[in-house]
Amino acid sequence: MKGISKILSASIALMKLENVYSATALCSNAYGLTPGQQGMAQQPSYVLIPSTPGTIANCASGSQDTYSPSPAAPTSPVTPGKTSENETSPSAPAEDVGTCKIAVLKHCDAPGTTSGTTPGSGPCETPEQQQPLSVISTTPAVPVTVESAQSPSVVPVVPVVAHHQAVPGYYNNGTSGIPGQQQILSGTLPPGATLCQGQAMPSTPGQQQILSGTLPPGVTLCQGQATPSTPGQQQVLSGTLPPGVTLCQGQATPSTPGQQQVLSGTLLPGATLCQDQGMPGTSGVPGQQGQSSGQCCAPQIPNPVMPPSMNISGNGYPSSTAYSPNLGSLGSCVDIQKTGGTSCEQKPEKSATQYAMEACATPTPTVIIGNSEYLVGPGMYNAINSPCNTAVQCC
């Protein structure tokens, strides 16, 4: 027991040096006493020492009923400098209170007396006898990091065209589209991404790239620098664009810096045709508008390649109708040409809507792209992107 007392006394001294105790008097006759015990002989007070300094915030606050001191043992006179057998609690030296493992130690060996108090009613030490505690160093308690279980953030998935809902530019057998066509993305898109965004380089058939490089002002992420490009990719060519030329989508034939391609193949709804700054003296290529042969060139855009039967579309028409692969001449679209001249004046006697109606046949089936249904008929996409709706350069 003497050995245990020495260990506990050394623990108290060590914790005093580590500033575990506060500056208030730890020995009080009111601690641990119920109202019925106030007039009785004083019981020794107890100091609750947490097992670790980090838990003192959990163990040091609470009602008196939370911590029950062990029953007092009869004390005997203690000679200063000597160690007594009853310095420790007669009960078990440790109690488990809630989640705090605390050691219960007796702070006072015997009640103290003062000139104005009687034994059993005053504090263990008079205010003159209480030695102030000097703070040697402040050792803050190690903060306890509580890691709360956070549910993983739900990433929204944007549905894209399924394999059985093939649309122009996408093929069920996994092969790449015709050069100049825009691919329909397979897989899932990132949140907020549109159909013009897809996988990073390198791309695979059925995907559309987000091209690397520096983007010119006003160009979105679905356009970028990629030279040379491959079928199914989207490129913005380097160099300076002529006034009024917009950024086109897709890739037709290999181009040089400063040129912009006009797509061959089929465009998606909303895609625009672009003008190509051709090389002087060269003839225009179908699908391009060049400055070469002295005549205005209208691109020949093939019909959408319809996929296999997809049952009946929403408008009641069968969606397995086959179409001619090419529209041929666009009819009234060519009436703005002037032959034998060096300039090309556009005649606005017909509106773009009239040109579109004349160039397009009666709408027949539809094709589903995402959650939208589009009419698909001969020249339907041409009505959206027809050269009749834009200024036609003189070649």
Swiss-Prot record:
Residues 68-80, 111-128, 280-300 have a biased composition (Low complexity). Sequence repeats lie at residues 179-204, 205-230, 231-256, 257-282. GO terms for biological process: sporulation resulting in formation of a cellular spore. Residues 81-91 have a biased composition (Polar residues). Residues 59-95, 111-133, 277-300 are annotated as: Disordered. GO terms for cellular component: polar tube. Residues 1-22 form the signal peptide. It is found in: Spore polar tube. Glycans are attached at N86, N173, N311. Residues 179-282 are annotated as: 4 X 26 AA approximate tandem repeats. The keyword Transferase does not apply. Keywords: Glycoprotein, Repeat, Signal, Sporulation. Interacts with PTP2 and PTP3. Involved with PTP2 and PTP3 in the formation of the polar tube through which the infectious agent is passed on to the host cell. Accounts for at least 70 percent of the mass of the polar tube. This is Polar tube protein 1. It comes from Encephalitozoon cuniculi (strain GB-M1).
